[in-house]
């Protein structure tokens, strides 16, 4: 799709620099006509800026890693919005199980809850499938201005989110979380 308006589709590819940017990981996506020379040049460029290339072999909305992230994010939002689990408990479980520095809700706060909502709306506009709509509870957070890190409040309060506190992973301070 990115090359649709370009006369030389063999010279086009798409890059998605990951957040947080200090991860130095970039997803690169070819189209059906990206030439071998362009692929080699793209990979050489990413290596020259000390980024790790993750290759998506052909075009797909959202790249590969973001599609996997979307499935996780969508299910986490559903579990929260339908009252099955507290976001902090789900983040604790995720962080303990996969040894990460933050969980899905912490990551959504980093990305920005308005951005999370807009991405879900983009999928809905393309599919027309109501299951692609963001949950109303997320819409309400965005309407209140609770956008995550950038606004100081989202699923956590910033600049010192609960998941960085000593003992938080063990459930200490749970009653203070609200």
List the predicted regions and their residue ranges.
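NAD(P)-dependent Rossmann-like dehydrogenase/reductase catalytic/cofactor-binding core
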Residues: 5-7, 11-14, 20, 33-41, ...
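Gly-rich Lys/Arg/Thr-decorated short loops/hinges at beta-loop-alpha junctions or inter-strand turns
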Residues: 22-24
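Short, surface-exposed amphipathic charged segments that create phosphate/polyanion-binding patches used
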Residues: 27-30
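Structural/interface elements that position substrates and couple domains in central-metabolism enzymes
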Residues: 33, 69-75
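C-terminal alpha-helical interaction appendages
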Residues: 77-79
């Amino acid at each position: 799709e990115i090359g649709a308006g370009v006369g030389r589709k063999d010279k086009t590819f798409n890059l998605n620099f990951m957040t947080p940017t200090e991860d130095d990981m970039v997803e690169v996506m070819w189209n059906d006509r990206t030439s071998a020379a362009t692929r080699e040049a793209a990979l050489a460029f990413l290596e020259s800026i000390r980024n790790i290339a993750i290759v998506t072999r052909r075009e797909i909305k959202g790249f590969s890693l973001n599609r996997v992230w979307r499935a996780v994010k969508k299910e986490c939002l559903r579990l929260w919005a339908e009252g099955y689990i507290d976001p902090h408990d789900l983040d604790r479980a995720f962080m303990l199980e996969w040894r990460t520095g933050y969980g899905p809700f912490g990551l959504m706060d980093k990305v920005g809850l308005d951005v999370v909502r807009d991405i879900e709306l983009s999928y809905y506009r393309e599919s027309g499938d109501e299951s692609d709509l963001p949950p109303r509870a997320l819409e309400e957070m965005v309407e209140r201005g609770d956008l995550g890190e950038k606004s100081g409040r989202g699923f956590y309060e910033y600049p010192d989110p609960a998941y960085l506190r000593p003992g938080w992973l063990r459930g200490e301070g749970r009653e203070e979380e609200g």
